[in-house]
Amino acid sequence: MRLLLFAFTVTAFAGFAQVQRIEMTFEGVNCVPCVESMATRTMRIRGVESASVDGAKGVLTVQLARQNRVRVEQIRDLIQQDGTKAVRAVVEVTGTVARDETGAWILRIPKQALPLELKSSTTYELGATVNVRGVIEDLKRSPLLRLALR
């Protein structure tokens, strides 16, 4: 189960929505050159403005262009290419509030394969664009990223 804990603000702009920043924690590093090349490999992804790795803390920090098509899964998969385990991610994302087929609140992010489920007692305005920052605690493949607002 993926759990995202987020603070959010509603903004007046629309027109684009995507992940803006990702800090992904990893563990199980068996290949020092793999970790050292992680930032370089990340920079090859179109839409990445900067990438840095703190090997001692096991954190890859990725800053994305304002308008990009980068998905959280892309960064997770890049880290896991060499057997390293992606553990959690702190993300900053902008998206549009919607409802899924069951009526649950979700955050739609264009080009993002997985919607974010908004888990909160808060009532949302359909179609509102929100900025959120939160934590994905479980990065296993799943049909839905879970988003719990504080």
Regions found by a protein language model. Name each.
Residues 18-36, 147:
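Short N-terminal segments immediately surrounding and downstream of signal-peptide cleavage
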Residues 38-41, 72-82:
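Short amphipathic alpha-helices in soluble, non-transmembrane regions
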Residues 7-17:
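Hydrophobic h-region of N-terminal signal peptides that target proteins for export
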Residues 121-133:
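Short nucleic-acid-contacting surface segments enriched for D/E, G, S/T with interspersed K/R
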